[in-house]
Curated annotation (Swiss-Prot):
Lineage, highest ranks first: Eukaryota, Amoebozoa, Evosea, Eumycetozoa, Dictyostelia
Protein species of origin: Dictyostelium discoideum
TM stretches of this protein: 1-19
One GO cellular component term noted in the UniProt record for this chain: membrane
Record: residues binding heme: 431
Protein's UniProt name: Probable cytochrome P450 508B1
Co-factor requirement: heme
Enzyme category, top tier: oxidoreductase
Cellular localisation: Membrane
Length: 484
């Protein structure tokens, strides 16, 4: 009897799912691959969705639809359409889809990644906090961390041992986030495989992989409420890493509550406490916003540093040209300053080319359409509650905007702007920390090249590790040869 009930329920779900997917919804509905009941097109994504969706772009065009289970999903990789959606029609696309994984990751209704009206107040606070932070204080913080990174690398250069950048890049960006959010220093004398760094790196990596991959429970409507409860109480692989990082941040919150001087905020957490602590219901917003900034500010920038080292050892002629430009800019100085940026156009172009060829967040965070809308001069219909994915990798490989897109060619960004270059997103939900991230990238990239010739040790590197919210290369090593 029970078996028959489940069988009938299963058949009903398949039939209703098929009807929903195959029903024509609008005369200008988007094209896309044929979906199957329940799964939709999930089975076609494979283990490397960033490659799959770029291939689909070549078949179905710059905007197309997929069915992620029951979730109607729009994939866009055209800069004109992206700006029309997220700038001209910001109000319709400003919220996130209410999927269990992202709802859990956003702490329900809290933080910068939430999907309600409160995110605008939270985002404005964070933006104002970043503006109020002394430029000199930020620069001194960055300068100190760059110095420590170069010092660590010199130890490998002196001994001649091959150098692996991954953990050092994460320590560099984590140290900056520690100082900016918690006013806390990480000692560079600390063993990189132990202490605070090791305590956080592994769970943070797991979080980004889990958020990027998505699970079947996110996309089957009838399963979503049950899957959310599973994430909260049973899924140790997902809940465990979040719990580790949240406990870490909560401990800092308690320390700040006991030591805060409300008239002289030390860091971002003090500013958040000043803004939200009058309402106890908003304490989770303080914690979740700190978590969002901590995660976003670390992994994406660390990944870009890793990609930079990989691409430079692959292209010694480009590396040498950039070094000569940097050397001309700094003269006898032993370090590069942010004020040198206008004098290093080729290095600036290298940074853009790395972010184009290897976008660290291949899809960013998804958006949601609040209402039915037609875009592209009436050509493309997007239904209410669609999930919107910006295919940043597909955008960077769009031959309409980038000639020979598979080629690493920084010169494409010299003496001209390209409207298709948008690695930090556009509109009101673009990366809130893009200025800080850009400064981190410039100072780390330039000072690495000023000090070291990055040499290939002869071992081929396969491009990507396991797919996640951010993408990094598999671990690799380089030889560091002194430039002095």
């Amino acid at each position: 009897m029970l078996f028959n009930i489940f069988l009938y329920l299963f058949i009903f779900c398949i039939v209703s799912s098929g009807i929903k997917k195959y029903k024509k919804i609008h005369k200008n509905e988007l094209s896309g691959p044929f979906p199957i009941p329940l799964l939709g097109n999930l089975h076609q994504l494979g283990k490397e969705p960033h490659y799959t969706l770029t291939k689909m772009h070549n078949v179905y065009g710059e905007i197309f639809r997929l069915h992620f289970g029951d979730v109607y999903t729009v994939v866009v990789s055209d800069p004109i359409l992206i700006r029309e959606m997220f700038v001209d029609n910001h109000e319709n696309f400003k919220y996130r889809p209410l999927l269990p994984t992202f709802k859990f990751g956003a702490g329900g209704d809290h933080g910068l990644s939430l999907s309600n009206e409160r995110w605008e107040r939270t985002r404005e606070l964070v933006q104002n906090a970043m503006k109020r932070t002394s430029i000199k204080k930020i620069y001194d913080m960055l300068d100190s961390q760059v110095y420590e990174l170069i010092k660590s690398m010199k130890q490998y250069q002196v001994t001649g041992n091959p150098f692996e950048i991954h953990l050092y890049a994460q320590r560099f960006t984590l140290s900056i986030m520690f100082k900016y959010i918690f006013n806390e220093d990480i000692s560079y004398d600390e063993d990189i495989t132990k202490g605070k760094i090791a305590e956080l790196v592994q769970p943070m990596d797991q979080i980004f992989k889990s958020l990027g991959s998505g699970k079947l429970g996110d996309f089957i409507s009838i399963a979503q409420p049950f899957y959310y409860q599973w994430l909260k109480f049973s899924d140790k692989q997902f809940n465990g890493p979040f719990s580790t990082v949240k406990k870490f941040i909560y401990k800092r919150y308690l320390e700040h509550i006991n030591t805060i001087d409300h008239d002289n905020p030390r860091d971002l957490m003090d500013l958040l406490i000043n803004e939200f602590s009058n309402d106890k219901n908003l304490i989770p917003t303080i914690l979740q916003t700190s978590l969002d900034m901590f995660l976003a500010g670390n992994d994406t920038t660390a990944a870009s540093i890793i990609w930079f080292v990989l691409r430079m050892q692959e292209h010694p002629e480009i590396q040498l040209k950039a070094y000569n430009e940097i050397k001309d800019a700094v003269g006898d100085r032993d370090r590069v300053l942010l004020s040198d940026r206008p004098k290093t156009p080729y290095l600036n172009a290298i940074i853009k080319e790395i972010l184009r060829l290897n976008p660290v967040g291949p899809f960013g965070l998804p958006h949601r359409s609040s209402n039915d809308i037609v875009i592209g001069n009436g050509k493309y219909f997007i239904p209410k509650d669609s999930q919107i994915l910006v295919n940043y990798r597909g955008l960077g490989f769009n031959e309409k905007y980038f000639e020979n897109p598979s080629q690493f060619d920084p010169s494409r960004f010299l003496n001209k702007n390209n409207d298709a270059y948008m690695p930090f997103g556009v509109g009101d939900r673009k990366c809130v920390g893009l200025q800080l991230a850009g400064d981190e990238q410039y100072l780390s990239f330039s000072n690495i090249l000023l000090n070291f010739n990055l040499k290939n040790i002869g071992t081929p590197v396969s491009d990507y590790e396991e797919f996640g919210l951010t993408l990094k290369p598999n671990k690799f090593k380089v030889l560091l040869e002194s430039r002095k």
